[in-house]
């Protein structure tokens, strides 16, 4: 199966597993997906992840996080910059998601960062996704 947008597939797999209240989800690995997963872990949206090599590209197993009463930690995931319509912003125009309650994930020259980290480093880039 050929994917035209592997990042959208990554976000959709997490969104679907989260909505179905699965404990974990397995996603084909890539360097960008590993960076996105690390940001989700740092920001507290997922419990943990593990990368296993399968002889091809590898698999990322993400353990999802839920509240004490089973409520979802991830309320929403939205792909912003798509292959058909890229969305670039300067450091001055970095978006705030829900007035700071969510995060924007930005691909910059300094790597893949959250909107807050990009503001601190004063770099702009391509807005990959919003997570709240």
From Swiss-Prot:
GO terms for biological process: translation. It comes from Lactobacillus delbrueckii subsp. bulgaricus (strain ATCC 11842 / DSM 20081 / BCRC 10696 / JCM 1002 / NBRC 13953 / NCIMB 11778 / NCTC 12712 / WDCM 00102 / Lb 14). One of its GO terms (molecular function) is rRNA binding. GO terms for cellular component: ribonucleoprotein complex; ribosome. PANTHER family: 40S RIBOSOMAL PROTEIN S15A (PTHR11758). It comes from the Bacteria. The keyword rRNA-binding applies. HAMAP family: Ribosomal_uS8_B (MF_01302_B). Belongs to the universal ribosomal protein uS8 family. Part of the 30S ribosomal subunit. Contacts proteins S5 and S12. This is Small ribosomal subunit protein uS8. Keywords: Ribonucleoprotein, Ribosomal protein, RNA-binding, rRNA-binding. One of the primary rRNA binding proteins, it binds directly to 16S rRNA central domain where it helps coordinate assembly of the platform of the 30S subunit.
